[in-house]
């Protein structure tokens, strides 16, 4: 209770200080993002569009001339579609929920002393990710909306929001996750959560395995790739895999500390296209070939400082060889 009263007092002082600054000039002179957010909410304004909102088409641009000859014909051009725009609109709206954002910021600062950021997000139910819309998923896999298969395994599924995009196509949905709070979110969605050392030893195979933005955040990415190959249905099975490029692998530990992984993927080059060119060899060592790939934005819900966050993803469909 004392902690809450202390926080409330600090917040009141912040409002008082902000009010004094407002008398000195309009909102454009408020340099702090928090101050601008407070001002906009108090004035009933949603503020200007998010910076760079008019440049969203750049998220999908690939210079195909810089791709190797074998990769050029299997590149799938993607675009900003309705599903992506809905996520962006919802994220922008949530970032304007001032008191909720302040509460999230306060809780995060306390819990970060003994919890990872991922677990904090799972506890608060915030920070959902977006990799692809249902239409983008179907186009990449070359399936129609009515297509059905048996088993899906989503490795590192987080809160299950991306799993939800794929789940209508499968009879059984399995997921893995390290964070206990994210496991709780997955169980609320009725997904079958398997242990980190359990999914490789279930005795059955999966028709589709998704590994979305996991390899750059796990300790043994090569082992994950090889284990994925061993439990994939050998003829019709497919892996849908996303990597943030440029590739910067780190593993998050309790307390938000980041460490280098014990296994290294030999991804070469500097640009998005150069690193994509080196990936057929990486996947080949694990028994996969690239069937199709695209460039998509890896989006995350924002906070009081940004409407949303975005990284550059390369999303691959891999087939066993």
UniProtKB/Swiss-Prot annotation:
Top-level EC class: transferase
Cellular component GO terms, alphabetical: endoplasmic reticulum; mitochondrion
Predominant location category: endoplasmic reticulum
Alphabetically ordered keywords of this record: Endoplasmic reticulum, Glycoprotein, Methyltransferase, Mitochondrion, Signal, Transferase
Enzyme Commission no: 2.1.1.-
Secretion signal, residue range per the UniProt entry: 1-24
Residues of this chain annotated as glycosylated in UniProt: 89
Family from the record: Belongs to the METTL9 family.
UniProt-recorded name of the protein: Protein-L-histidine N-pros-methyltransferase
Organism field: Gallus gallus
């Amino acid at each position: 209770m004392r902690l809450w009263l202390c926080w409330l007092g600090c917040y009141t002082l912040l409002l008082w200080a902000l009010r004094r600054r407002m008398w000195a000039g309009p909102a454009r002179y408020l340099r702090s993002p928090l101050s601008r957010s407070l001002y906009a909410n108090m004035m009933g304004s949603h503020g200007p569009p998010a910076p760079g909102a008019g440049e969203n088409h750049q998220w999908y641009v690939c210079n195909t001339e810089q791709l190797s000859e074998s990769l050029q014909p299997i590149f799938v051009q993607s675009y900003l579609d309705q599903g992506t725009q809905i996520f962006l609109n919802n994220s922008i709206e949530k970032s304007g929920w001032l008191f909720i954002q302040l509460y999230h910021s306060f809780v995060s600062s306390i819990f970060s002393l003994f919890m990872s950021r991922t677990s904090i997000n799972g506890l608060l139910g915030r920070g959902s990710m977006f990799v692809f819309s249902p239409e983008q998923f179907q186009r990449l896999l070359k399936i129609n909306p009515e297509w059905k298969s048996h088993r899906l395994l989503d490795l590192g599924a987080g809160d299950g929001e991306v799993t939800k995009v794929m789940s209508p196509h499968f009879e059984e949905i399995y997921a893995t996750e390290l964070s206990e709070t994210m496991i709780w979110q997955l169980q609320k969605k009725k997904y079958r959560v398997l242990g980190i050392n359990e999914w490789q030893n279930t005795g059955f195979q999966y028709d589709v395995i998704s590994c979305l933005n996991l390899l750059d955040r796990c300790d043994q990415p090569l082992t994950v790739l090889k284990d994925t190959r061993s439990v994939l249905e050998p003829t019709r099975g497919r892996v849908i895999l996303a990597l943030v490029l440029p590739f910067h692998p780190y593993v998050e530990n309790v307390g938000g500390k980041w460490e280098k992984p014990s296994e290294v993927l030999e991804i070469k080059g500097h640009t998005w296209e150069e690193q994509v060119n080196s990936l057929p060899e990486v996947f080949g060592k694990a028994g996969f070939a690239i069937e199709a790939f695209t460039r998509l934005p890896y989006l995350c819900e924002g906070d009081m400082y940004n409407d949303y966050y975005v990284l550059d993803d390369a999303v691959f469909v891999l087939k066993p060889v």
